[in-house]
Swiss-Prot record:
GO terms for cellular component: cytosol; glycine cleavage complex. InterPro entries: GCS_T, GCS_T_bac, GCST_C, GCV_T_N, GcvT/YgfZ/DmdA, GcvT/YgfZ_C, TrmE/GcvT_dom1. This is Aminomethyltransferase. It comes from the Bacteria. It holds the Pfam family GCV_T. It catalyses: N(6)-[(R)-S(8)-aminomethyldihydrolipoyl]-L-lysyl-[protein] + (6S)-5,6,7,8-tetrahydrofolate = N(6)-[(R)-dihydrolipoyl]-L-lysyl-[protein] + (6R)-5,10-methylene-5,6,7,8-tetrahydrofolate + NH4(+). The glycine cleavage system is composed of four proteins: P, T, L and H. The gene is gcvT. GO terms for molecular function: aminomethyltransferase activity; transaminase activity. Keywords: Aminotransferase, Transferase. It comes from Stenotrophomonas maltophilia (strain K279a). Belongs to the GcvT family.
Amino acid sequence: MTQKTLLNDTHRALGAKMVDFGGWDMPIHYGSQLDEHHLVRRESGVFDVSHMTVVDLRGDQVRPFLRRLLANSVDKLKVPGKALYSCMLNPRGGVIDDLIVYYLGDDFFRMVVNASTREKDLAWLREQAAPFGVSVEQRPDLAILAVQGPQARAIVIGLARESEREALTKLGRFAALQVQSDDGVELFVARTGYTGEDGFEILLPQDAVVAFWNRLLAAGVKPAGLGARDTLRLEAGMNLYGQDMDEEISPYEAALAWTVSLDEGRDFIGRDALEAQKAAGTARQMIGLVMDEKGVLRHGQAVTTAGGQGEILSGTFSPTLAKGIAFARVPAGELGEVTVDIRGRQVPVRVVKFPFVREGQAQPGVLADA
């Protein structure tokens, strides 16, 4: 049975086109995916991401548990409220899921994981947490709104209690703060996002989410759907689980080496496999592609390099760049001239570093010919 967030009727009243997204009835757009994309890049937009999974982890051994569970190191989290992006891996080094974890106390961490992997993730977390005596509590009572764009933070701060606005203004990136709205709603506000823009992701009680959504719209934020969320995250060089990586792909093959922390000698799940892969060299690499010809790069298209064949993972037309962009996984080594098979024609593409766009601007080399 299709699941719905509490904002489902609200989305429909706003004229949203609804689609099935991993078993959830979610808005893909509210009239124009293109307009919503540009609004987030230039002003502000709000996404209902209440389908995501919030998990609270508690216990005296919660930090040792996370040191074992995650490829990135929670030892980097020294100040309460700070957040970390990481993958949790299987023993083969494949990605079970990517997630954000928040350090909220010596015996309390909060994690946000994907919606499509919920049951698998919860089962894995509980299995791994048991020897540490750590409790794993899913929080279906919390909704999540992502308010993103250059104007997003100022608008949200304006809805907070006056006494807490200064602290929210000073909140650093990848950090969270528990505050109240000016009408008394508890808000867990994190300066994180999945768009490449500044903004907040807000966890709040389900019974308050419709009213808070309406307050955001009244303050000038426009609703944005999952279509714009996908083009924004791809421009921002952010992976999508299940499309860009999965349990058969290691972080090294998914351009996520920066999320692997081997230095401090932790015995985390998947470490042995990653060390072996690092020593032998990975067979595949994930690269960014830009197409200067008109057209769209799409998932599954064949990519030819000097080293052999690969394929496009995530591809789209970039509204900000007005060009086709993509992630592709191809054989490791020299790439040479790279082409993509589009309806039987080998179309030349350029290999570029991603992100393609950062805070509304094309990154160096993305627009110019190599």
